[in-house]
Amino acid sequence: MIKIAVLGYGIVGSGVVHVLDKNAERIYKNAGQRVDVKYILDIRDFPDCPYNSLFAKDFETIVSDPEVTVVVEVIGGADAALTYTRRCLEAGKSVVTSNKELVAEHGSELLKLAMEKGVNYLFEASVGGGIPVIRPLAQCMTANTISEIYGILNGTTNYILTDMERNGAEFSAALFEAQNKGYAESDPTADIEGHDTCRKICILSSLAFGHHIYPRSVPTEGITGVTINDMRYAAALGYKIKLLGRSRAVGEKVSVYVAPHLVNKHSILAEVDDVMNGVVIRGNAVGNVVFCGAGAGKLPTASAVVADVIDAVKHLYARKWISWTDGSEDLIADPVLLASAWYIRTDASCEKVEKEFGSVLFADDTGSETAFVTSVMNGKMVSELLNRGIKAYSQFRILGDH
């Protein structure tokens, strides 16, 4: 029997304990050993919890117990979680986490420490919730050279954009609705400003390209600038608006950014609506591989965490090879130099737009505004043309017909 500890009994932590309990026989069959929760660490009291006897308030009890071989860290944040993770790895315990902030900021350090101690640091649930994307990228696609990753990585923003598109809701109303349904936090900043998506694309990019991509190096734009008019014009032009995290190999460097994009309404990602997530990974042998599913939620995320627990149990004496080196600003390419078509909304006349941009595709029925799609050009060129007297109210890349 394998003894484990769960650090944190919030939404994900309680889901993990629930899945381990309710699916115990299935987990035993897949892991080859019984998996027993010995401790749940939380400073709060849960007097009515059926697992009340398992609670501990002192981390030292857990880290010093030689019976505990796998620790699940679902505290969140990068403060106490970092300290606890380091201590557990140093003590020779494998760690499983859903903590995207911790992996995005400290992944290279923690993977190196796990390697030195001969244990595992696993984080399938840190990206995509219940969607299996880390393991396929790290194992099933290792014969490929990855050239690009892009996707809808945040369910909150995708729900808001879907509500705006379908129901004509203003951004503020769509956000309020998302909060009422529990899809958005009371402070939604990390979601709507793109920080959550940034952390996730950093993790995927670090794994795919082999060196740590730090969130601070990634230009990040959220969805607060997307308007109802943008939604209407995009639809008229044959597109939907989605917030994407995107990374692309540029020679020996990697270009990574987060921003709203117009995606072709007939593309796969255009069909990923509401709180669903979708990720596309392009390999030079396999082509495009698409992963879609529930990107958040108690049980979908717990499902991914428990899958990693099973993996850790099966590899107690054989380390899984998941690693990347530390990163450097020298390895990051500026996305402003990436070429694409662009959607622009302005109050400039069609004549002025055509004078500066040449042949463009205009949206119909835009009233006093002008909305158009440019030919393919990089962001630097777009800025130069706009500086000739065209004020852009919105400026989004076109993903293309992927």
Describe every region a protein language model picked out:
Residues L7, I11, G15, V35, ...:
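Conserved active-site and cofactor/substrate-binding residues in soluble primary-metabolism enzymes
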Residues L175-E271, M276-G278:
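Substrate-binding/catalytic subdomain of NAD(P)-dependent oxidoreductase enzymes
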Residues M1-E90:
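N-terminal glycine-/serine-/threonine-rich beta1-alpha1-beta2 phosphate-ribose binding loop
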Residues V309-H402:
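A conserved regulatory-domain signal marking ACT and ACT-like small-molecule sensing domains
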Residues A81-R87, A91, S98-A138:
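Rossmann-fold NAD(P)-binding glycine/threonine-rich loop
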Residues I146-Y150, N158-L161, E165, E177, ...:
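Catalytic, metal-anchored helix/loop core of enzyme active sites in primary metabolism
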